[in-house]
Amino acid sequence: MKDRYILAFETSCDETSVAVLKNETELLSNVIASQIESHKRFGGVVPEVASRHHVEVITVCIEEALAEAGISEEQVTAVAVTYGPGLVGALLVGLAAAKSFAWAHDIPLIPVNHMAGHLMAAQSVEPLEFPLLALLVSGGHTELVYVSQAGDYKIVGETRDDAVGEAYDKVGRVMGLTYPAGREIDQLAHQGRDMYDFPRAMIKEDNLEFSFSGLKSAFINLHHNAQQKGEALSNQDLSASFQAAVMDILMAKTKKALEKYPVKTLVVAGGVAANQGLRERLAAEIQDVKVIIPPLRLCGDNAGMIAYASVSEWNKKNFAGLDLNAKPSLAFETME
């Protein structure tokens, strides 16, 4: 059988990425051009700046991905692209590049949900067994997803306000840390003590919903009040206390979901899945279910994960026309 090569594009936020996947499982290349340095001084992602950067580097990323994979343009069998959720201007750059490539080579265009990409990055670890449950934790999302089969995603619980990654970046800014702050808070937390009693919102409620706005506000108020009194607080202790509260919430809701939906596999994915504290808690507390976390290089935004997620869409012949548009608010369906 002839080899199949998927060329995948990811430009939903501040990473320009192009990857090549061979025969559904072998990731030959995964080129990522990060813009973090450009956004650091603003303390967050500036959509206009992100879009301009994507335009500047997308062509080079395509060339590098093909070269690294050792294939020519003519060998590409299909093109996969993130069409949402994300920043509309950023998404449009990837869509324009993907559609142009698909049109020029007369090959199928596969639309991929960015969050399905995060989830299916777990395929790089081992073949996934369905049904499974996924905890998706990133800068823009915190959700529990039931996956009955590849490509069939249903939200069973999500945040009512801030995403967990967003909360990390906001408290990081209060502590004077550079953006993005998640990794640094994780490191500081391992050096400090959990000595501040931050709220664990909705932790005892009988649902699978999350809330991080109260925790974020309590953190900001504590820090502000200490500054007003001229007291110096330890960033290590603040980080340890904040992270302990976050992990308590994530673990409580995940355990509750596993009770309600008895599956054999739990996938934990998204940028926050790189957090060492979260990985430690999962290893210590989730015993009877196989926990699969993508490798660190596939936790953040990347096109490799989009390629993995596109396989089930390809197998279902779920192709898009060249009129495919960006859907910045795209979301999985909610379980009824």
Curated annotation (Swiss-Prot):
Substrate binds at residues 136-140, 169, 182, 186, 275. It is an enzyme of class 2 (transferase). GO terms for cellular component: cytoplasm. It comes from the Bacteria. It catalyses: L-threonylcarbamoyladenylate + adenosine(37) in tRNA = N(6)-L-threonylcarbamoyladenosine(37) in tRNA + AMP + H(+). Binds 1 Fe(2+) ion per subunit. It is found in: Cytoplasm. Its EC number is 2.3.1.234. InterPro entries: ATPase_NBD (IPR043129), Gcp-like_dom (IPR000905), KAE1/TsaD (IPR017861), Peptidase_M22_CS (IPR017860), TsaD (IPR022450). Fe cation binds at residues 114, 118, 301. Its cofactor is Fe(2+). One of its GO terms (molecular function) is iron ion binding. Its main location: cytoplasm. One of its GO terms (biological process) is tRNA threonylcarbamoyladenosine modification. Pfam families: TsaD. The keyword Iron applies. Keywords: Acyltransferase, Cytoplasm, Iron, Metal-binding, Transferase, tRNA processing. Belongs to the KAE1 / TsaD family. PANTHER family: TRNA N6-ADENOSINE THREONYLCARBAMOYLTRANSFERASE, TRNA N6-ADENOSINE THREONYLCARBAMOYLTRANSFERASE, MITOCHONDRIAL. Required for the formation of a threonylcarbamoyl group on adenosine at position 37 (t(6)A37) in tRNAs that read codons beginning with adenine. Is involved in the transfer of the threonylcarbamoyl moiety of threonylcarbamoyl-AMP (TC-AMP) to the N6 group of A37, together with TsaE and TsaB. TsaD likely plays a direct catalytic role in this reaction. This is tRNA N6-adenosine threonylcarbamoyltransferase. It comes from Streptococcus gordonii (strain Challis / ATCC 35105 / BCRC 15272 / CH1 / DL1 / V288).
